[in-house]
């Protein structure tokens, strides 16, 4: 394979084919063609995937106005690097947007803080050029004191974590066909991201970061952990970049800023996400699996109605080492 196949239409033809073309496997197979060509990922150290701690500023208060344009309505998410706010665009009547806050580590040196700001603006510029139906559109970015902001479309709907919890509370599973439909849309978004120059990695794919709109469209949200892969510079790290969520994080993403990731790392996280959607429970962490491989329970043990092909595809996407995937 010399270049990835692209598009939901291509995927829809392949999904009914052999095991290597089902949802998670197809996406990881495609991603392998865009993997970093500077060398194989090395074995990382077992660091904390959430990185170091620093003082987080309190959330902005409702009715705060930023850039004389955006009025904060409410906080809709909060993490270790800042908050996400539902906001009103005062220049465009009736438009609501999401403000993604990325705080500067004030414990770092002035030079490091300036480098972080410069990196934020370079990468935010790339994100603003992205245009895909399964990604929220980034329309603006700016700095306000020790806070940087991305302005994105506000995506209405329910995240897939809530959909899984709803099914679980009823003693049911989300239908396999439905999950594969979502997977097709996610694959299309990831192939688009990974095909950029340089490739854009999401690095925090999980059910809570995937929205299902009232129209049935999947949106991969929360660009706050994005990393750009710059050729010959594996150190390209940004204040935008986080470490991911341990349950969905591949082994190569551990080790702090020294962890080596490429598009196949996103595919692992997609596989782990599909595992959760299909079984009603997240998979064992990669670090635990490295020490005790049997900790990963086969999906069909938890949900016997799953097809063997889908189970094998999910497990393939969750291979412990990226090089285990055939190119």
Model-based region annotation:
Residues 88-97:
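Conserved N-lobe loop of protein kinases adjacent to the ATP-binding glycine-rich P-loop
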Residues 103-129:
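AlphaC helix of the eukaryotic protein kinase fold
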Residues 73-80, 84:
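Protein kinase glycine-rich loop
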